[in-house]
Amino acid sequence: LSLRGEQRTVCESLIEVETFKLKIYGESQITFNNVNIKEFDVDVYGESQLTMQKGIIDYQSITAFGEGKINAVEVKNRKGKYRAIGEAIFRVNTSEHIKFTAFGEAELYYKGNPEIDKGFGVGASTINQIN
C-alpha cells in the first residue's frame, strides 16, 4: 500500500495478513484501528504520522526519512527494527528485541523489556523506556 500527499486515512476494519508493506509520502495521517500482521514493513517519507490503535505484530521494520511520527505503543510486537534519518519519533511496545539506528535527532520510546541493540548512528538520538 502506498499513500501520498496530505490526506487522512483510517483503516477501520481488522488488517490480518502474513506480510504488509506500507509506504507513506508527504504529510499524511494514517490510522489502523486493529492489526494482526506477521511481518510489517513501513517506510515513512516526510512529516507523516502512523498510528496503530491495537493488535499484534510479530516483526516490524519501520524506516522514517524526515520528521515522521510512529505510534504503535498499543500494539503488541515481538521484534522490531527501527531506522531514522532525521527527527523521527517512534513509540512502540516490543517484548523481545529492538534494533534502533538513527542519523539525526530521532527518539525511541518503548514499552516492554526487550533487548536493545543500538546500531550505528550519528546525532543526538535518545532511547527511553515508558513502562
List each language-model region with its residue ranges.
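Short acidic/polar N-terminal linker immediately downstream of export determinants
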Residues: 9-11, 125-131
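Extracellular beta-strand-rich, repetitive "passenger/adhesive" scaffolds
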Residues: 3-6, 25
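Residues at the loop-to-beta-strand transition
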Residues: 7, 28, 48, 68, ...
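Glycine-rich hexapeptide-repeat left-handed beta-helix
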Residues: 104, 118-123
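Short "repeat-start/strand-capping" segments in structured domains, especially the N-termini
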Residues: 1, 13-22, 32-42, 52-62, ...
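Solenoidal tandem-repeat scaffolds enriched in leucines and small polar residues
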Residues: 50-51, 64-70, 84-86
